[in-house]
Amino acid sequence: MAADPLPPSAMVQPGTLNLNNEVVKMRKEVKRIRVLVIRKLVRSVGRLKSKKGTEDALLKNQRRAQRLLEEIHAMKELKPDVVTKSALSDDINFEKTCKKPDSTATDRAVARLAGHPLLKKKIDVLKDAVQAFKDARQSAPAAESSESTSGEGRCKDIARSKDDARESQHPERTVVREQKAKDTNTAAKNAASGSKEKLAKTEQAPRAGTTPGSQGRPSGKGAGVNSEHQGAPAPGDSNQGKASTKTPEDSVCEPANNGVSEEEESEGEKEYFDDSTEERFYKQSSASEDSDSGDDFFIGKVRRTRKKESGVHSSAKELKPLPKVPSKTSTLETPWDVRNDKHRPIPEARKFESVFFHSLAGPKSSRRDPREQAPKNKAPDFPENEPPVKKQFTKSAYRGFESVKQTMQAPLHPSWEASRRRKEQQSKIAVFQGKKITFDD
């Protein structure tokens, strides 16, 4: 029996098949079919109970009605997913399950629901979709491999056909290509042979240049004559020496000239060494200064020590103290001068105030001049005049305190008045500190 096609909403794509989702979608259908089946079974139970006949027929009908009731209760307890999965896994036939002697009410209920025509259509469609999905997955690798091989074969065939068509249309081009290839091969061979000939000529030329020079040298002359010839060679000989390479005879004649050549080499090395190091640079710069001293080893050190000494002298010059200006306070003053200085006008008003000493916090007239304080250790000639000076300092401090009192006697806030009175009382009490106070005092 061929399965009817599903509507577009229920169609299953083989590429995106998820069986669990399909089972969940089937729950609604299973519940609707279960209601229809239960309604039908209830009607049949009522019919069986209403039948009349012999006692055996009545007992038989009662047993059938009891079975149907058990199936109805089993259907109510069944879950829709169990019905769908069992229908998808096996081909369930209701008649076969009923004929089994050990079949239970749940087995019969599942078989009855799965055998319903509406649910059976949906289950068949799902089975077909699952089978198509399996076939697609199995045939996909084989199809890809066959397509790839066929595509490669087609590309090769197309390329060959295009080449054949071009050759058939333009046969002259193929001939030109072949000729070009032959020309390139012959040119490469000619270039290789020409390079070999040039190398052979260059090898023969230096050999021909070296042999006449070696034959023309006299063998009987001593080492002194050879050294003279080497010391002052002719310009033509020098050019020949540059062009030709050294031969074994030249290398044999070299030990006779060691004396002159070693001196020249040592001079060249010394000049090179003088230019390359810092101490030799100092030596060249100080050659005019130290020309008398023949010892070259200590010249670099002398230059460094001179630099250090010059640096020390410059720093000492910078750190020289400035000439001291004699201060006015350093001169000795007598107490008589101090007394006379009192009446002099103060040159500059000083703005230093003390928090702890009232004598320093007073107005300008009551402040002490710093010159009033007689230096104790610098003026030891007048020891008998020290007590009057001290009394004078205490008097001036007391005057300053009184002037502060006068300035504070302006009308103030009550709290300020109270603090002022308290301070006055404290100043009076301070007189009696350390004494026994009697009633008369």
Curated annotation (Swiss-Prot):
Residues 137-342, 357-389, 406-441 are annotated as: Disordered. Transmembrane segments: none annotated. Residues 139-152 have a biased composition (Low complexity). Highly expressed in heart, skeletal muscle, liver, kidney, testis and brain. Also expressed in white adipose tissue. Expression is up-regulated in cardiomyopathic heart. Residues 52-77, 118-140 form a coiled coil. It is found in: Cytoplasm, Perinuclear region. Residues 153-183, 269-282, 308-321, 366-381 have a biased composition (Basic and acidic residues). The keyword Isomerase does not apply. The modification Phosphoserine is found at residues 214, 276, 291, 293. There is a cross-link at residues 201, 328 (Glycyl lysine isopeptide (Lys-Gly) (interchain with G-Cter in SUMO2)). One of its GO terms (cellular component) is perinuclear region of cytoplasm. Interacts with SRF. Forms complexes with SRF and SRF cofactors ARID2, MYOCD and NKX2-5. Interacts with the N-terminus of SLC2A4. May be involved in regulating transcriptional activation of cardiac genes during the aging process. May play a role in biosynthesis and/or processing of SLC2A4 in adipose cells. This is Serum response factor-binding protein 1. It comes from Mus musculus (Mouse).
